Curated annotation (Swiss-Prot):
This is Tyrosine-protein kinase fyna. Residues 82-143 form the SH3 domain. A lipid is attached at residues 3, 6 (S-palmitoyl cysteine). ATP binds at residues 277-285, 299. The gene is fyna. Pfam families: PK_Tyr_Ser-Thr, SH2, SH3_1. The keyword Iron does not apply. It comes from Danio rerio. PROSITE patterns: PROTEIN_KINASE_ATP, PROTEIN_KINASE_DOM, PROTEIN_KINASE_TYR, SH2, SH3. Tyrosine-protein kinase implicated in the control of cell growth. Plays a role in the regulation of intracellular calcium levels. Required in brain development and mature brain function with important roles in the regulation of axon growth, axon guidance, and neurite extension. Role in cntn1-mediated signaling. Required for convergent extension cell movements during gastrulation, acting with yes via rhoa. May be required for epiboly to occur, possibly through its effects in calcium signaling. It catalyses: L-tyrosyl-[protein] + ATP = O-phospho-L-tyrosyl-[protein] + ADP + H(+).
């Protein structure tokens, strides 16, 4: 059961979601992590009318909630000929420029213009102020999207991560779109027992033909709100009653502000470098602020590292890549020294985190989960037909609650330093690089898979340099002869077997990132269900 070959190589075969029904505590699933919901891209001039339950779908677009959810699609029409659909703030927001609007959670808005996609022009009914607001900070009044417990397109694994973090009590819950059943939802609840300790149970919420909802046919409800109210009063067959909605973190913004959405080359003087976080071969990383009010990370590149023109061209692509497991590129200063402005990650690089930070004490479940997050981000890069080229723990950043995000994707191609471009030069990361890429420059998503296998060794050894005791030349020679790193101390053989799959000589025989994500997310259920923590892992 544990061997990698026994599993189908393509995760697409693993499509039924593990959910628990009240009457049947069985059922197994795997669904790949969908591209997250945090960045609705509308490109429509009319806002769907969420309050008209029977409005025909005129645009074929559901701004919130996805297919057949309670986001009632249709063009914006006046109710009774006068009013408009009102939106409510889900979070506090502080204006970052003179064009956007500060507001508090619960404030209501009239939307004036939604053509900007990520930013909507709105009028606050509380203050009367007009300006741009981030569209993922608001939801239609009285919709399920406005409920604290509704998390939209959140994958099963991410639901578990959120419920099991921050010391949530038993009965903490959320509702999300089902990954596998169109129009259905999943109720995820944190539970506890003496055998498993803290864990999460998932229940499928099915939809009736007449529009109602049920977990078990014995109890049917017109709305999800009624369902939540019912199970908050009594468990009624669930593992426990619903106690408190899971804390919903602030959504990430796609841009620094509405002003930088299209013009994201920013003046150097708008950035303040506050604290140096790291120093690498090609520059430094700083924690800083933009406009004096927005915390960012700033990567400064040494002059001559890459051509500003080539960088700007690549940055146009990087800016379009949006996924929860990728560090978001916000803006650039393209004149030398080049500045790259991204979201700030509080715990720094995964390498430093494992070697010198809180990561030193992590056990295998956390480490495998971090690997699964990286695989999820790389699966998105795979779907977008992009390549990272320099995947290693130094280029993974860690945030609160052990969130991992991939940084520096695509930049390696642009480096013009001779010690790097020679590929066997001192600055080139030979130990992480697939042989066909190191020897012949054949960089593909499959060479990224090789690098991911090396990153797995970094995780289980808490940041040890790969191929200990060997220099770059020896590594290249030995790997060409068929040498592969042995199983690290205390690492389960099934995980080492996965590494060996990543290090197949023929790139096409290496697994996809979609498969790697599936394998790692299900690792302790399907592969190592008997895992017991040891001294090291």
């Amino acid at each position: 059961m544990g061997c990698v070959q026994c599993k189908d190589k393509e995760a697409t075969k693993l499509t039924d979601e593990r959910e628990t029904s009240v009457s049947q505590h069985a059922g197994y699933r795997y669904g790949s992590d969908p591209t997250p919901q945090h960045y609705p891209s509308f490109g429509v001039t009319a806002i769907p009318n969420y309050n008209n339950f029977h409005a025909p779908v005129s645009q074929g677009v559901t701004v919130f909630g996805g297919v057949n959810s309670s986001s009632h699609s249709g063009t914006l029409r006046s109710r009774g000929g006068t009013g408009v659909t009102l939106f409510v703030a889900l979070y506090d927001y502080e204006a970052r420029s003179e064009d956007d609007l500060s507001f508090r959670k619960g404030e209501k808005f009239q939307i004036l213009n939604s053509t900007e996609g990520d930013w909507w022009e709105a009028r606050s009914l509380t203050t009367g102020g007009t300006g741009y607001i981030p569209s993922n900070y608001v939801a239609p009044v009285d919709s399920i999207q406005a409920e604290d417990w509704y998390f939209g397109k959140l994958g099963r694994k991410d639901a578990e991560r959120q419920l099991l973090s921050n010391g949530n009590p038993r009965g903490t819950f959320l509702i999300r779109e089902s990954e596998t059943t169109k129009g259905a939802y999943s109720l995820s609840i944190q539970d506890w027992d003496e055998t498993k300790g803290d864990h999460v149970k998932h229940y499928k919420i099915r939809k009736l033909d007449n529009g109602g909802y049920y977990i078990t046919t014995r109890a049917q409800f017109e709305t999800l709100q009624q369902l939540v109210h019912h199970y908050s009063a009594r468990a009624a067959g669930l593992c426990c009653r619903l106690i408190v909605p899971c804390h919903k973190g602030m959504p990430r913004l796609a841009d620094l502000s509405v002003k930088t959405k299209d013009v994201w080359e920013i003046p150097r003087e708008s950035l303040q470098l506050i604290k140096r976080l790291g120093n690498g071969q090609f520059g430094e990383v700083w924690m800083g602020t933009w406009n004096g009010n927005t915390k960012v990370a700033v990567k400064t590149l040494k002059p001559g590292t890459m051509s500003p023109e080539s960088f700007l061209e690549e940055a146009q692509i990087m800016k379009k890549l949006r996924h929860d497991k990728l560090v978001q590129l916000y803006a650039v200063v393209s004149e030398e020294p080049i500045y790259i402005v991204t979201e700030y990650m509080s715990k720094g690089s995964l390498l430093d985190f494992l070697k010198d930070g809180e990561g030193r004490g992590l056990k295998l479940p956390n480490l495998v989960d971090m690997a699964a997050q990286v695989a999820a981000g790389m699966a998105y890069i795979e779907r977008m037909n992009y390549i990272h080229r320099d995947l290693r723990s130094a280029n993974i950043l860690v945030g609160d609650s052990l969130v991992c995000k991939i940084a520096d994707f695509g930049l390696a191609r642009l480096i013009e330093d001779n010690e790097y471009t020679a590929r066997q030069g001192a600055k080139f990361p030979i130990k992480w690089t697939a042989p066909e890429a190191a020897l012949y420059g054949r960089f593909t998503i499959k060479s990224d898979v090789w690098s991911f296998g090396i990153l797995l060794t970094e995780l289980v050894t808490k940041g040890r340099v790969p191929y200990p005791g060997m220099n770059n030349r020896e590594v290249l020679e030995q790997v060409e002869r068929g040498y592969r790193m042995p199983c690290p101390q205390d690492c389960p053989s099934s995980l080492h077997e996965l590494m060996l799959q990543c290090w197949k000589r023929d790139p096409e025989e290496r697994p996809t990132f979609e498969y790697l994500q599936a394998f790692l997310e299900d690792y302790f259920t399907a592969t190592e269900p008997q895992y017991q923590p040891g001294d090291n892992l």
